[in-house]
From Swiss-Prot:
The keyword Ribonucleoprotein applies. One of its GO terms (molecular function) is rRNA binding. GO terms for cellular component: cytosolic large ribosomal subunit. Keywords: Ribonucleoprotein, Ribosomal protein, RNA-binding, rRNA-binding. Belongs to the universal ribosomal protein uL6 family. This protein binds to the 23S rRNA, and is important in its secondary structure. It is located near the subunit interface in the base of the L7/L12 stalk, and near the tRNA binding site of the peptidyltransferase center. It comes from Chlamydia trachomatis serovar D (strain ATCC VR-885 / DSM 19411 / UW-3/Cx). NCBIfam families: L6_bact (TIGR03654). GO terms for biological process: cytoplasmic translation. PANTHER family: 60S/50S RIBOSOMAL PROTEIN L6/L9, LARGE RIBOSOMAL SUBUNIT PROTEIN UL6M. This is Large ribosomal subunit protein uL6. The lineage of its organism: Bacteria, Pseudomonadati, Chlamydiota, Chlamydiia, Chlamydiales.
C-alpha cells in the first residue's frame, strides 16, 4: 500500500473539490482542473480533507492505484492553489528565445529559427533572452512542454551547450587527448 496515500489531502483555503459520476473537479484561485477517476479507487471529501481509498472489489495490489490517484489529486490541488513552474536556461553562443504571440521562437544554432506553439493553459515568458519560464496549473502539461523545449537542443557533454533545466547538472566528458611524442 502507498504510504503517502494513507494520509488525507488537506485542502488549502479557497480550494474546492467536487465529485460527479466518475470525475473529480478541483477549483481554486488560479483556475480549475478535472480528472476522470478509475473504478478501482474511491474518493471521499470530508470537510477540508480528501481521502483516497481502493475500491472494495480490488484485490490485486490496491496500493498502486491508490497512490497514483492520491498524487494526481494532490498535484491538482497544488496547481489550482499555487501553480507550477519550470525554468530552462539556454547556454551557447547566439542562443536566444522570444515569445511571439502564441509561439515560442528559439534560436539554437541551426540555420532556421525553431518555432513551437505554446499549449493553451500555459504562460511562457523569457528573461534576459536565455532564461525561459513556463508556468501553469497542470503539472503534466508544464513538465511535458518543458521537456519538449529541452529536447530541441539537449545539453551536450563536451562543452555543455544546449537547453537545460535551471540548476540541472550536466555530466561533462573530457575531449580528445592531444598526441604526445615525436613522429
Amino acid at each position: 500500500m502507498s504510504r503517502k496515500a494513507r494520509d488525507p489531502i488537506v485542502l488549502p483555503q479557497g480550494v474546492e473539490v467536487s465529485i460527479q459520476n466518475d470525475e473529480i473537479s478541483v477549483k481554486g484561485p488560479k483556475g480549475s482542473l478535472t480528472q476522470v477517476l478509475a473504478k478501482e479507487v474511491e474518493i471521499a471529501v470530508k470537510g477540508n480533507e480528501v481521502f483516497v481509498t481502493p475500491a472494495a472489489h480490488v484485490v490485486d495490489r490496491p496500493g498502486r492505484i491508490q497512490g497514483l490517484y492520491w498524487a494526481l489529486i494532490a498535484n491538482m490541488v497544488k496547481g489550482v492553489h499555487t501553480g507550477f513552474e519550470k525554468r530552462l536556461e539556454m547556454i551557447g553562443v547566439g542562443f536566444r528565445a522570444a515569445v511571439q504571440g502564441s509561439l515560442l521562437d528559439l534560436s539554437i544554432g541551426v540555420s532556421h529559427p525553431t518555432k513551437m506553439p505554446i499549449p493553451t493553459g500555459l504562460e511562457v515568458s523569457v528573461e534576459k533572452n536565455t532564461l525561459i519560464s513556463i508556468k501553469g496549473i497542470n503539472k503534466q502539461l508544464v513538465g511535458e512542454f518543458a521537456a519538449c523545449v529541452r529536447a530541441k537542443r539537449p545539453p551536450e557533454p563536451y562543452k555543455g551547450k544546449g537547453i537545460r533545466y535551471e540548476n540541472e547538472y550536466v555530466r561533462r566528458k573530457a575531449g580528445k587527448a592531444a598526441k604526445t611524442g615525436k613522429k
